[in-house]
Amino acid sequence: MMLPQNRFNFTPNKQRRRAKILKILVLLAGSAAAFAGGTALYRLGLRYVSSSDAVDHKTIRLLWEEKNYGEIIRVTDSILKKNPMDPHALVFNGFANFYTGVNQTSAEDKIFYIDAAVKSLRRAKLHSRPPLRGEADYILGKSYYHKGLHYADLSARYMLDSIQEKYIGQDSYEYLGLAFSSLGEYGESLKYFLKAGENNPSDLLFLTLAQTYYQLGDKASSEEYLMRAVNKSQDPLLTEKARFLLGDIYFQNKEYIKSEEQYLKVLEMNPQSPDTHFHLGEVYAALGDGVKARAYYRRALRIDPNHFGALRRLYN
């Protein structure tokens, strides 16, 4: 059975500090989703829809073909009122709640549906041989990732279980990379991001690989993947993040002219970035141009009067 793939890759809508860069995906949450359906899910999934009620059975088949998740929730809820442990109703209830949840704009609504998905799928797994076991673990892994940082271990656990059950989604390795990154296990994270890149070498994945190498202290590899991201991407926000990190790497390597070039390109895309003005100030200070450095610190403060770095440079 193939579930809808790569539907929830996210691009943040504002620049964050380096310490938070790895949260891009799926970023993940609070940003626009990029959708790509997997129609094989609906063909193969129909073989597993089952109910003692033939009408309910037919209804779920039709709703699944139509991707009508709201009605699937309603119908399976009705089945579960009569038989709370119906494994097929639990599985499809979980799937439908998950796909409904990730499309919510309200965080409260999103968590409501995600929690319902987890509840149904965990109950389905109480059966010795639940239907669609690998697919259920896959959706559980994604659900726990979307529940937040404190559930990253469970996200990794269930995604690994789904792979062990011979189900590998197009984004399985990306979710594993994200989960291990959230756990601070960057070596494991890198392993799965590289596997993801074998099949889906996207600009976002290149950026994520660059960030992971950066966290591991491998600046040369980080630079390589940042340049790949810049050359491939048509997304200005992603390009901005890649160039900002390139500027930081060049600064650490004392390649100040290269660093200046990247930060100036960031300002062309986002002239109201206080961090970029501040880092340009740092570049000019390192080059011995104190007047220009202070000018950029002041620009950072005009945009963000509480910018800690600029305040420290100007008033300490």
Language-model-derived ranges and their functions:
Residues 2-126:
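N-terminal leader/linker segments that initiate helical-solenoid repeat arrays
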Residues 52-53, 87-88, 131-134, 169-171, ...:
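Helix-start (N-cap) detector for alpha-helical repeat units in TPR-like alpha-solenoids
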Residues 61, 95, 99-102, 142, ...:
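Residue-level recognition of tetratricopeptide repeat
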Residues 82, 127-129, 165, 198-199, ...:
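Structural marker of alpha-solenoid helical repeat scaffolds
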